[in-house]
Every structure is written in C-alpha cells, then in structure tokens.
Amino acid sequence: MRSGYPQMENTDATPPVTRALAMISPALDPSIDIVVCIPCFRRPHYLRQTLESLAQQRTNRRFAVVMVENDASRSESVPVASSFLAAGKFPGVCVVEPRQGNCRAINAAFETALAMFPNATSFLMIDDDEIASRDWLERMVSAAEATGADIVGGPVLPEFDDERKRGLRRHPAFAPAYDASGPVPVIYGCGNCLIRRPVFARLADPAFDLRFNFLGGGDTDFFWRCRLDGMTFHWVEEAVITETVPESRTKPRWIALRGLRIGAINYHVQRKAAQTGWRRFKLTLKMLAMLPLSLFHAGRLVLTEHRALMAMHPMAVAAGSALAALGIEPQPYKASKIT
C-alpha cells in the first residue's frame, strides 16, 4: 500500500521510450481490418493456450494479433509469440514495451495496432491468461456490425485450477457484469472487448490513463469516459472467454485485496469526474459513509448466500474506497507485486 491519487504515475513527466519490435510475420498485410491485442507479462504457459485458441477461431474474417511483452528483462512471452508467428498460425507482431505497468502494456498494444493496421476498424482484446471460445471473434465482430455499437463486451468465465472452488463463480470478483445479450450502459473490463477505431480518435491520448498504471482500473476509467462521451455499448453473452484462475487467487486474502482494489478504482474514477474541491470533498464523505452501509449489505448476503466470502466483498470494496479517499491504495500491477 502507498499514498494515493496525487502520487499515481505522472503522465507528463515520463520521457518517450522506443518500443522494440521482437517479431513480425513475413509479408504482413497492413490492410487487415480486425486486430486482436494481447498484453503479456510473465505467463508464457497461459499465453500459449491463449494463442492456440485464437489460431482455432471459426471465422472467414482475416485478423492479425498484436502481442506486447511488458517484462523487458525476462521477455518470457517473446519466444511463445514468435513461435506462433513463425509457424504462420496467424499474422501479427510482437513488441516489447520497456516501461512496466498495466496501462503501459495496453496502450502499447492499441497504439501499435492502430499504427501498423491503418485500415483496421475493430480492435479486440484478450488477456494472456484467457482462452477464447471457437466463435468468439466472429460473434464479437458480427455484433458490432449488426448493432453499430462503439464498444462490444462479452463474459469472462472463471476456470478454477481447484474444481472445489467452483462455488466462487458467483462471487462478484469473478462473475460477469451481465448475463444476457443486448445494449448495456457500460462495460467495466477489457479482458473481452471490441473497440471501434473512431473511439480512440474521440478520446484523449493515451487511451488508458497512466494514473491507473499500477493500481489497475484503467479499463474501467476508459469505458466510463466513453459513456460520458455518449458512446454506445453492447453485450454478447455467447462470445465467451474463459479465464484460468490459479489456486492462489481463490484464497480469502487475495479475494479481499481484490475487493479493496475495486473500491480504490471506483473512488479514483469518480474523483476524476469531480472537477471542483467541493465535489471532491462530498465524494470523500460519500466513500467514508459507505463503510457502515457495507455492514448492512454484508449481513444481507450472509442471509441470502450463506457464504462468508461473498458477504465480505461489499465491506472490502467500501474499505478500499475509503482508504483511497485517505490516500492509501494497493499497487497490484507493480512488477515487484507479481509472481
């Protein structure tokens, strides 16, 4: 934990750094109009499964894959990415972003895709520990074309290493935001999303605010800004992605810290929208008032869900918001915090 929002990564003080091109497909066609972006960090085994799921997509559409290695010292993802590109399983590139952090990696992926594929209209994203269902890309792109939505989202369903943890699928830390296809007010995560090209032109650069670089939540902030700008969202329940959840992420401590992080993100997203000192003061009071209210919500969940971990979530979120308002927050995306 460290002191909060004013010390989040400064977007102006960081000098530009050149990204290294680690691998590019032979005779890469820049006219491809669909690009899948993958930020990569120290999960080469899972990345291999992610890329295999992309290679097996059932679609006649041409697409490219942009992979961003965000650990320049180890570069464990580069050999995996290079092997798929060299084998011609799909066209694409792998670049190395030397500046560490979640938002750095995602921005590098989107910026590379936008620059290298000037005709691309649809930019999808999947994480390097996720597996796309066979029709994922086709369903996402078809929905975007049919609805005209600016942004399309789909469910990320947890797959637990320990099947005894299957009951956690309904926990807010793992459950998708929606359970039916159709228009939605906003989506919250970028682990299963499609963004149309004009979206990037309408928002300021960089797309993902670097103040969320180590906290996380740059995607929540990005989509919230899109909503405030009047952009439209659509949910495709059938465009399923599964996420590999290791046993370490099912422990009560990790789930509690996830709740704290969600609370901190909620505070910072709302703080950005609070333009005056008075509004920020009221926001701080609101976040502090959520603590006693969370006890009521926790009690209700104990009665309805009969699960202590489920009941703990609203208290952890409220505590995370209150701590962030006081200048204390987790930093799960610092390299030193990731194993």
Could you say what each language-model-derived stretch is?
Residues G154-P155, R169-V186:
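Short, flexible, basic/aromatic active-site loop/helix in glycosyltransferases
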Residues E52-R62:
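Short, acidic, metal-binding catalytic loop of nucleotide-sugar glycosyltransferases
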Residues L257-A264, Q275-T339:
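Non-catalytic, C-terminal membrane-associated alpha-helical segments of glycosyltransferases
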Residues P118-I131:
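Short beta-strand-to-loop acidic/aromatic patch adjacent to the donor-nucleotide binding site
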Residues M67-V80, E130:
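A conserved acidic beta->alpha catalytic loop
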Residues N213-W224:
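Acidic donor-binding loop at a coil-to-helix junction in glycosyltransferase catalytic cores
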Residues E97-M116:
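Glycine-rich, basic loop-to-helix element that forms the pyrophosphate-binding segment
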